[in-house]
């Protein structure tokens, strides 16, 4: 099961699964998921694609129900949305959608699938967090907040499942800025970070996928992101917030 599989990291994760012979159940809120599914089928695996909004319980239930009668060996929970700009200037419907996609829908799906895995006594879960969770996200406050939650949640869930001797592993992939549709959809194309050089989603996906197969607890993709998280752990939050604001403030990009 792969969420957010129509493009970016999720698409590349699904490709890796297909290359290894996994049959796929993929979902995205973008109609491009159907075209993506055709690409996955080129690897000779069975692919079932759904378009659904995982910000809603109905969307999550639709995806979960489609998996009934199948053994789910791995859940790759990658779906997520960003949102740039000052918090007070954002439409709260947009704010709520980011929270409901990145947090509520994600953990609702994980709970449902992980219960089945625990009952069966095996399974692998890969959750896409972010290095953004280490930094107060000035001008992307809600998004960074959701990723701080997801990073923390992933570590805690892994510890719970280990304590229960469940044989279900949880891996948190924490990428940095990646060359996807994220910044366009988040309205951050005019920012310094939106216009910066980004990581290749195929490279990011490979790091996370291999970590999942190896049962690793967490992995930061890319050397510069590893350095950033190390520095962030010893830097005052106020300093981090100021630094983030300089990169994410609307109009901060060099093309403006």
Which residue ranges define each predicted feature?
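Conserved glycine-rich cofactor-binding loop
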Residues: 6-7
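Conserved glycine-rich Rossmann-like NAD(P)H-binding loop of the short-chain dehydrogenase/reductase
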Residues: 20-35
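Conserved NAD(P)H cofactor-binding loop of Rossmann-fold oxidoreductase domains
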Residues: 78-83
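Substrate-binding pocket helix/loop in short-chain dehydrogenase/reductase
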Residues: 86-87, 91-99
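Active-site helix of classical SDR
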Residues: 110, 146
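Residue(s) in the substrate-gating loop at a strand-loop-helix junction
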Residues: 130
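C-terminal helical subdomain
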Residues: 172, 192-229
């Amino acid at each position: 099961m792969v969420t957010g599989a129509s493009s970016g990291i999720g698409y590349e994760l699904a490709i890796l699964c297909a290359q290894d012979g996994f049959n796929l159940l993929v979902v995205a809120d973008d109609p491009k998921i159907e075209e993506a599914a055709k690409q996955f089928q080129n690897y000779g695996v069975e692919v079932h694609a759904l378009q659904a909004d995982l910000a809603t319980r109905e969307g999550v239930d639709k995806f979960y129900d489609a998996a009934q009668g199948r053994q789910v060996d791995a859940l790759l929970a990658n779906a997520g949305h960003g949102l740039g700009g000052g918090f007070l200037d954002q439409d709260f419907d947009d704010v709520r959608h980011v929270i409901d996609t990145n947090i509520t829908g994600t953990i609702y799906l994980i709970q449902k699938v992980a219960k089945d895995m625990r009952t069966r006594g095996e399974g692998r879960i890969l959750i896409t967090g972010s290095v953004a969770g280490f930094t107060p996200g000035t001008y992307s406050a809600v998004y960074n907040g959701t990723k701080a939650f997801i990073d923390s949640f992933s570590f805690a869930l892994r510890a719970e499942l280990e304590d229960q001797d469940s044989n279900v592993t949880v891996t948190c992939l924490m990428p940095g800025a990646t060359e996807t549709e994220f910044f366009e959809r988040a309205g951050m194309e005019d920012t310094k970070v939106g216009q910066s050089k980004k990581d290749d989603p195929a490279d990011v996906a490979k790091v996370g996928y291999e970590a999942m197969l190896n049962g690793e607890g967490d992995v930061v993709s890319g050397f510069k992101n590893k350095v950033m998280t190390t520095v962030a752990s010893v830097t005052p939050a106020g300093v981090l917030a100021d630094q983030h604001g300089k990169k994410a403030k609307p109009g901060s990009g060099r093309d403006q």
